[in-house]
């Protein structure tokens, strides 16, 4: 059985609706995806270029010369985890910014860098809602990782409770808080 396709005018209208609702993090200056191919993405984090696996990249175009500029590549291990293959010397950690926020970046043993830059669209959404609320806002950020959403909400004026089970990630969030100049009061439930 086949369904008739909607007329061209209706398809165009649907596309326009999607475009109006699609959020794009257009304030990045220190992060960009340079290219993608064969299960990998080539990313620029400040002045450092990394190749990381991405299972959603299923197309296989030829990798151009820009891939030769990579400073490091994360290689998965068949036993789980993986490691970074270093092509060029780069810092162990460095700082990037998004709008008025600053973040420590450091490639980890599980392919992450300490930040999910695609979440910036959500940070912008939160900031807009908090800034236009017309009342004090309190936010509970669970599984808060290194604090991107926490810092965005705090920068917009919210009172934020940042929660993550990993002490290492909470410590990293504190570093990001200091880099961004946000005042956060911290405590650890395990210490009380």
What are these regions (language model features)?
Residues 118-132:
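Conserved alpha-helix/loop element of class I SAM-dependent methyltransferases that forms part
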Residues 173-174:
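Conserved SAM-binding loop
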Residues 136-142:
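Conserved class I S-adenosyl-L-methionine
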Residues 146-157:
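Conserved SAM-binding loop of SAM-dependent methyltransferases across substrates and taxa
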Residues 185-190:
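Conserved small/polar residues in nucleotide/adenosyl-binding loops
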Residues 159-164:
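Conserved SAM-binding motif I beta-strand of class I
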Residues 29-43, 50-117, 124:
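Non-catalytic substrate-recognition/targeting regions of SAM-dependent transferases
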């Amino acid at each position: 059985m086949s369904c008739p396709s909607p007329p061209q005018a209706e398809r165009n209208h649907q596309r326009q609706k999607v475009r109006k609702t699609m959020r794009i993090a257009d304030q990045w200056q220190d992060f960009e995806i340079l290219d993608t191919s064969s299960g990998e993405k080539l990313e620029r984090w400040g002045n450092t270029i990394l190749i990381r696996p991405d299972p959603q990249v299923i197309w296989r175009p030829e990798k151009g010369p820009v891939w030769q500029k990579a400073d490091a590549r994360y290689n998965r291990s068949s036993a789980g985890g993986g490691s970074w293959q270093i092509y060029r010397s780069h810092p162990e950690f460095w700082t990037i910014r998004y709008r008025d926020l600053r973040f420590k970046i450091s490639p980890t043993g599980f392919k992450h860098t300490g930040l999910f830059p695609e979440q910036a669209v959500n940070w912008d959404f939160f900031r807009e809602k908090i800034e236009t609320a017309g009342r004090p806002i309190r936010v509970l950020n669970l599984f808060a990782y290194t604090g991107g959403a926490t810092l965005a909400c705090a920068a917009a004026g919210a009172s934020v409770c940042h929660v993550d089970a990993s002490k290492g990630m909470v410590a990293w969030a504190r570093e990001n808080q200091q880099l961004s100049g946000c005042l956060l009061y911290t405590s650890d439930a395990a210490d009380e």
